[in-house]
């Protein structure tokens, strides 16, 4: 066992040979968009992301389904499964089966098995003092999804969020491997502050980030100001408050945005300064939605984060 639940990592990793290890993870959730096919795509991309966060590639998947068959047509379930299957195929993996139950609320996701060379896996326990922090997708999907549920999200925000959530993290993982990155996590339900804090705590280090360097989805700030804040985002901020310090002048909306609960978010990478140019160039060549240097790892109380205003200036 190379990685288990004790490290708060994205997946378990089990060595099966000197040069091969299996990655095991699972994830599922309720719909966050109206279209069933798109929901299937998003749920699959979100589940596959944990494999990419560990530096691996997905191999096999099992469908996990909860469906209210007396309330929703099976045609809609078929669309969900097609969306998931198409995303898994895009990742170069295969769905081998799965399990379904009758459920009052629809749910879909995957159990995923991937592989990685044991010497090339990335974990959230390998960040070092001096590393630069790079984010590969804009954030704000939780805010936009909440507005979608209320019928308040404009078309540009829906489009931007959907594009982000249906983009695989395969290119980001490949770029990280090419730059020798050893510390990575994906930004999902605990938000940027939560997942960064977990990485820092596991690595025994602290960090500074600059709010102005963090990329945002189109329309997310406006929707947050209008009050479309998920409950999970508020809980994330409350949880992060014990380890996060803020420069003067931040309002609650700005703080909540950095804690926004993400679905199928990007990778957060900690890279040595000498390898940063290679990483950024590779991210651009792989067409990732962002390649944003947002801060740096430093010494300090493990897990602590200092948030500055403005853009990052190393």
Give the residues covered by each predicted segment.
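Intrinsically disordered, low-complexity, positively charged segments
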Residues: 1-8
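Glycine- and other small-residue-rich loops at beta-strand/loop junctions that grip anionic moieties
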Residues: 2, 99, 125, 136, ...
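Phosphate-centric recognition/catalysis
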Residues: 13
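Glycine-rich anion-binding loops of enzyme active sites
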Residues: 16-32, 38-41, 57-154, 192, ...
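Short pre-catalytic strand/loop immediately N-terminal to key active-site residues, enriched for Gly-Thr
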Residues: 37, 157-164, 182-183, 254-257
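Alpha-helical scaffold segments that flank or form the walls of functional sites
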Residues: 38-54
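Glycine-/charge-enriched secondary-structure boundary and capping motifs
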Residues: 69-94, 101-108, 178, 184-314
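Active-site glycine-rich loop that binds ribose-phosphate moieties when present
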Residues: 111-121, 155-176, 250
């Amino acid at each position: 066992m190379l990685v288990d639940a004790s490290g708060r990592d994205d997946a378990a990793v089990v060595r099966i040979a000197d040069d091969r290890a299996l990655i095991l993870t699972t994830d599922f959730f309720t719909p966050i968009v109206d279209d069933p096919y798109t929901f299937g795509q998003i749920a699959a991309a979100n589940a596959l992301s944990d494999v990419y966060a560990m530096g691996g590639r997905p191999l096999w998947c099992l469908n996990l389904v909860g469906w209210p068959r007396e309330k929703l047509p099976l045609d809609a379930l078929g669309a969900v499964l097609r969306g998931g299957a198409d995303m898994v195929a895009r990742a170069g993996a295969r769905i081998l089966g799965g399990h379904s139950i009758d459920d009052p609320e629809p749910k879909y996701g995957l159990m995923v098995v991937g592989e990685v060379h044991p010497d090339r896996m990335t974990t959230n326990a390998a960040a070092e003092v001096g590393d630069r922090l790079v984010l590969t997708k804009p954030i704000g999907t939780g805010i936009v999804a909440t507005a979608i549920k209320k019928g308040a999200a404009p078309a540009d925000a829906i489009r931007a969020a959907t594009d982000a959530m249906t983009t695989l993290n395969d290119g980001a993982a490949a770029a990280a491997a090419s730059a020798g990155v050893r510390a990575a996590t994906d930004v999902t339900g605990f938000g940027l502050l939560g997942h960064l804090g977990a990485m820092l705590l596991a690595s025994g280090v602290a960090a500074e980030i600059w709010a102005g360097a963090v990329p945002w989805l189109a329309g997310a700030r406006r929707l947050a100001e209008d009050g479309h804040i998920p409950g999970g985002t508020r809980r994330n901020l409350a949880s992060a408050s014990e380890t996060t310090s803020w420069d003067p002048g931040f309002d609650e909306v700005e703080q909540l945005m950095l804690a926004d609960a993400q679905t199928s978010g990007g990778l957060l990478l900690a890279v040595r300064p000498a390898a940063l140019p290679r990483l950024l160039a590779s991210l651009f060549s792989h067409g990732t939605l962002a390649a944003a240097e947002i801060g740096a790892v430093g010494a300090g109380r493990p897990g602590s984060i200092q948030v500055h205003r403005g853009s990052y200036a190393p």
